[in-house]
From Swiss-Prot:
Active site: H94, E166
An annotated Gene Ontology molecular function: triose-phosphate isomerase activity
Protein name per UniProt: Triosephosphate isomerase
Native source species: Chromohalobacter salexigens (strain ATCC BAA-138 / DSM 3043 / CIP 106854 / NCIMB 13768 / 1H11)
UniProt binding sites for substrate: N9, W10, K11, G172, S211, G232, G233
Length: 249
């Protein structure tokens, strides 16, 4: 049985007031015990979020990390540093990082490995552009990204990874993959995994990211191979994010 995971990615948004609002809301929220919830605020709010969420059901995540433990990398943050703030999860390979910061598949793998070595739980983001989808290359693009990141890992390392399928054309656009489109890709990822590790294919969580909101979450989460969501804009609205969490029960 795979535990549903709802992860809120604030991106470069939020404020101290929002951190406090989340802390208060989730302290009083009756979250389903069967659902795991994580929030990924920007780096400056990690400590405030740690304190605001302390003792509650919500775990803390980061949005990226540098592959190195330390060094001359101005503006960067290492996995070791994140652990000091009680961070448990970290995103790697988000489409915005791949596109805006030119992170290659090799870069994503390096960050994934760094996260695992720092005892963090990486959420590996994969997905295709609209051009690739229209060309019928969705499966090829997504499975290439998955394989490049996971194939070199040991089985115990792969077991710590969650995969987030985020069609690039559905991020921040208001467009959403239909439940059937999302399920088709998730099933392909699970089938690919089964080719070299059948047990892991059944236990690995696959979550959907791409304009998931309170209105469409239940239908997406009802698909057999969708085990949760990587939520962007809706994660900045406390009530909407709570509603999505309840949809995953």
């Amino acid at each position: 049985m795979r535990t549903p995971l709802i992860a809120g990615n604030w991106k470069m948004n939020g404020s101290s007031a929002l951190v406090d609002a989340f802390g208060q809301a989730f302290a009083d929220a009756d979250l389903p015990e069967s659902v795991e919830v994580v929030v990924h605020p920007p780096f400056p709010y990690l400590d405030a979020a740690r304190r605001a969420l302390a003792g509650g059901p919500v775990k803390l995540g980061a949005q990226t990390l540098n592959p190195l433990h330390a060094g001359a990398r101005t503006g960067e943050v290492s996995g070791r540093m994140l652990k000091e703030f009680d961070v448990e999860y970290v995103l790697v390979g988000h489409s915005e990082r791949r596109e805006l910061y030119r992170e290659s598949d090799d870069d994503v793998y390096d960050r994934l490995l760094a996260a695992l070595n720092a005892d963090l739980r990486p959420i590996l983001c994969v997905g295709e552009t609209l051009e690739a989808r229209d060309a019928g290359r969705t499966r090829d693009v997504v499975l290439r990204q998955v394989g490049h990141a996971l194939a070199p890992l040991e089985p115990a390392q792969r077991a710590r990874v969650t995969i987030a399928y985020e069609p690039v054309w559905a991020i921040g656009t208001g467009r959403t993959a239909t439940p059937e489109q999302a399920q088709e890709v998730m099933a392909a990822i699970r089938e690919y995994q089964a080719g070299f590790d059948p047990a892991l294919a059944q236990s690995m969580r696959l979550i959907y990211g791409g304009s998931m909101n309170a209105a469409n979450a239940a239908e997406l989460l009802a698909q057999p191979d969708i085990d949760g969501g990587l939520v962007g804009g809706a994660s900045l609205k406390v009530d909407d994010f709570l509603a999505i969490c309840h949809s995953a029960r």
